[in-house]
From Swiss-Prot:
Stretches forming LRR repeats: 10-31, 40-61, 63-84, 86-107, 109-128
Cytoplasmic side: 1-248
Protein source organism: Xenopus tropicalis (Western clawed frog)
Chain segments carrying region Disordered: 170-240
Task of the protein: Required for nuclear import of FGF1.
Protein's UniProt name: Leucine-rich repeat-containing protein 59
Entry coiled-coil feature ranges: 154-223
UniProt xrefs under Pfam families: LRR_1, LRR_8
Phylogenetic placement of the source organism: Eukaryota, Metazoa, Chordata, Craniata, Vertebrata
Length: 308
């Protein structure tokens, strides 16, 4: 703090009335904080230094009326330079300025401007003129202010155009978002409906299966199965075994009788009767037939067909 106060005091020593001369001071930056403490210095000379730029807070020195920045290496002015609303005289001779900030149009008090020996853009250089005398510098201030107002208008129109484009883009995005949300709602609704239909089908199928199961169960209860037949008693089992044996014996006897009859028929009515076996069979047949002649019915039935 003491050091800052010391610098401020040094600056005050250079103050002559309302003029503060800091030219040829080998400055590479503007001591803005020290200058703020000297609002009386409405005329500030910073010419012939090593300044390459002005800090943004330099624009807070709105009380400055006359500013000399000639013969430095300043490439551009702060974007808020237009806040120096009391500035009437501005010397920018021999710097490296190419263009002026848009806010320059707000310097409505500016009456005198020198932009000689700067690599200005052609349009700005044409408006600035030569600035060879007092009259031309005043004309320069007037022409440049008019030009910068036009630039400001173009800038504002471009800004409005960009804002409108951003607004339109935002509206399009919002519209697309609404469409997407509506599509998502429809999709969810359709999926929910499909899920509901699937659940209904599953429920109906389950009901049908349960109904069929109940019908089968009821039918099984009404028609006793093989497992529910009454268990036979020992007496019934014995009778069943006896009947089974009798059926087997009857089958064997019937089979034997059929074989015997077939043998008799074969030996009686085929060429086999000449064989020894058939002669024996025929002899037995004749003996049996003779023994049964006493029965008229059997005699007629067993009568030798050859004798008929």
């Amino acid at each position: 703090m003491a050091r800052a106060n010391g610098r401020s005091q040094n600056l005050r020593d250079k103050l002559d009335g309302n003029e503060l001369d800091l030219s040829l001071s080998d400055l590479s930056e503007v001591p803005v904080r020290d200058l703020v403490a000297i609002p009386k210095a409405t005329a500030l000379d910073l010419s012939c230094n090593k300044l390459t730029s002005l800090p943004d807070d330099f624009c807070n020195l709105s009380y400055i009326v006359r500013l000399d920045l000639s013969k430095n290496q300043i490439a551009q002015l702060p974007s808020e330079f237009g806040r120096l609303v009391n500035l009437q005289h501005l010397d920018l001779l021999q710097n490296r300025i190419v263009a002026l900030p848009v806010s320059f149009a707000q310097l409505k008090s500016l009456k005198w401007l020198d932009l000689k020996d700067n690599p200005l853009k052609p349009a700005l250089a044409k408006v600035a003129g030569d600035c060879l005398d007092e009259k031309q510098c005043k004309e320069c201030a007037q022409g440049v202010l008019q030009y910068m107002k036009s630039v400001q208008s173009d800038h504002e129109r471009e800004l409005q155009r960009k804002l409108q484009l951003d607004k339109d883009r935002k509206q399009r995005l919002e519209a697309q978002q609404r469409v997407k949300e509506e599509q998502d709602r429809e999709l969810r609704k359709r999926m929910k409906q499909q899920q509901k239909e699937r659940k209904r089908r599953d429920y109906n199928a389950m009901q049908e299966a349960q109904k069929a199961l109940n019908n089968n169960k009821k039918k099984a209860e009404e028609e006793p199965s093989e497992n529910h037949k009454p268990v036979p008693t020992p007496k019934e089992k014995k009778l069943a075994r006896r009947q089974s044996r009798l059926r087997k014996i009857a089958c064997i006897l019937l089979f034997g009788l059929m074989v015997a009859l077939l043998g008799v028929v074969a030996c009686r009515f085929t060429d086999l009767k000449t064989f020894e076996v058939c002669r024996s069979v025929n002899a037995v047949y004749k003996e049996t037939l003779s023994a049964l002649h006493s029965n008229p019915v059997l005699e007629r039935f067993l009568q030798d067909p050859s004798s008929q």
